[in-house]
Amino acid sequence: MYLLSDDIFQVVDLNKENRGRKKWGIVVVFLLVLVVSSSSLLYWLWDREVDFEAYKTEVGETANNSLGRLTLNEVIMDDNQVLLNATFEPAKEFKPDHQVFFFPQVLVNGKDYMVRNGGQSIAKSANVYTIYNSIKMDDFPTDEILELDIRYKDWNVETRIEKPWEFQVEASQEQLQEDRHIFPIKKKVKHIDQQELMIDRVVSTPISTTIYFHSEKSIVNEALLFKIQSKGGQSWTFETPYPLNKEGTKWGSRLDGLYLSEKNYTLVPVDKDGSRLDSAIKIKKD
C-alpha cells in the first residue's frame, strides 16, 4: 500500500459529457465516490522508483497569465492515455474559493480524442502546487511521433481561464508500442443484470492495463467488474469502467501500475463480491 501525505488535495475525474455542466459541489461529491482510489495513482506514478524514461518527454516550459505561472514538466505516453506533470505558482492576487484543479484539453495531431479527464493537486508549499492529470482517449493515433497541443483552459471544473496556458509538445510513443502487449479476445460474456458484452481485447503496457469491451445497446448498469488471473494464482480486479463514446456502448476498464508480461492469463466477469458471473475466458498475447 502507498500512503499519500496530508497535503494532497482531493482527486476529481470528469468524462467529456460532464465537463462544464455540473456545479462544483455536486461534481466533487459524485465523482469522488467513483475515482479517488484509482486516480490517486497519478501521484504514486511519479513518486515511485520505476524507470518510465522511455515513455516520457521532458518539457520544462513555463507560461504566464493573471492566475500565475504554470510550468509543464513532463508528458508520459500510455495506451490511449496521456499523463501530465506540471507546477503551478499562483499570483498573489489569485485567491480561489475552492481547492485548485486544472483540466487541460489535449489535442493530438490537431484532433480531440479525449473521453475522460482526471486531475490531482498537491500543495508543496503555500505558493507552489504540483498538478497531475490523466487524459484518457479513444482511437488514439498510431504514429510513432505525435504533436500534442496542451491547453489549460479552465480550473475547478467550470471556471474558464481568460488567457489559457498553452504548450506544444512533440512526444514519441515508439518505445511504448514496442513494449505494449495486446491480447485479442472477441468473445461474448453475460455480466451483471444479464447484460451481454463483447470483450474486444486487453492491452497492457508498463504503465497500465486496459480491458476494452462493447455492447449493442447502451450499458445501463455500470457496475462492470472483471478479474484477470495469472497461471501462478495472482489476481487483479478491474472496477472502474468508463465510457468511450457518448452512446454508452463502447467502454474501457483500466488498472494503473499493472503490466501483463506473461503469455497467458484468464479474464473473468465478476460482481462486487468477486463472484463469477459467466465462464472464464482464456486470453493469449498476440
Each PLM stretch: what is its role?
Residues 1-8:
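N-terminal targeting leaders characterized by basic, low-complexity, disordered sequences
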Residues 8-13, 25-26, 37-286:
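Alpha-helical, hydrophobic structural elements that either
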Residues 17-32:
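N-terminal Sec-pathway targeting helices
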